[in-house]
Amino acid sequence: MEKVSFSKISVGDEIPELVKKVTLIDLLQYAAATWNFFLTHIDKEFAQKQGFQQVNIPAAYFGACLTKLVSDWIKDPGQIKKLGYRVIRMSFVDDTLKFKGKVSKKYQEAGQNLVDCELWVENQDGVQVATATATVSVLG
């Protein structure tokens, strides 16, 4: 995939989606990388004792995947200037999550080419489980 350039971006352009079937191994690796070993994110029996149907996906995992979605799209030397997200529904191990986005605004400010993006995450049933926004800078 070629690098994104400001001149070729249009409002409404879709960001290539990132699809992840989240496995227990993914969550264990994420726990190790972030030192977040809260048991509802890695132990099914503990999660069920806490009232969850299954091991649940930590909210910060969404942030990591949304960052990957955007950075894979803009590539180096593009930069993520701002990213904010909100998880609105629980997601669980073995869910398939689709990280999606589109360009909502394109502008120049302080000598930078900036692009605002609307982002969201859907589960395997097409239900939105997270929303997000990002601002990125890209070359001409």
Predicted features along the sequence, with ranges:
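Mid-chain, well-packed structural core segment of small domains
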Residues: 72-95
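Glycine-rich loops and low-complexity Gly/Arg-rich segments
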Residues: 40-46, 80-82, 110-111, 123-128
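Hot-dog-fold acyl-thioester-processing enzymes
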Residues: 1-79
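HotDog/MaoC-like acyl-thioester-processing domains
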Residues: 1-15, 91-140
